[in-house]
Amino acid sequence: DPFDVDGYAALLRRARTVRARAVYAPDFDREVHQPVAGSIPVLPEARLVITEGNYLLSPDPAWRAVRGLLDEVWYCELASDERVRRLVARHERFGKAADAARAWVASVDEPNAAAIAAWRDTADLVVDVASLGLPAGRD
């Protein structure tokens, strides 16, 4: 797994404890398919920090350590067909041909979604995204 879970945990620790200056978090640039360090400032006056990630409910020990740094973890549930539609559209928007986007979703994203769904019941709250009445998202 190329994700730096230990660095993520260190960032969350700093965001919780450092009050004298901003703490900077990375963003992910989908245009270049790379994280961009220091893109998101968490200001000292911030009292609520929202983070997102597929593995926040993972039973893996490194991810359990991350979960221990969070007050709550919510699972956002979306119907499978809508998730697939959004993922395919996102991959197409960032340069994949339609067939390649569908193949990627089927071989990578959907198996990942199945693993993540297995941890659903460990969430503090399950949010049914469709019930929120929001307009359909781009991704």
Please identify what each model-predicted range represents.
Residues 1-33:
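Conserved nucleotide-sensing/catalytic segment adjacent to the nucleotide-binding pocket
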Residues 26-31, 51-53, 103-106:
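Short, flexible loop segments at the rims of nucleotide/cofactor-binding pockets, characterized by
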Residues 32-90:
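ATP-dependent NMP and nucleoside kinases share a basic, alpha-helical "lid"
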Residues 22-23, 48, 97-101:
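Short, basic, glycine/proline-bearing loop/turn elements
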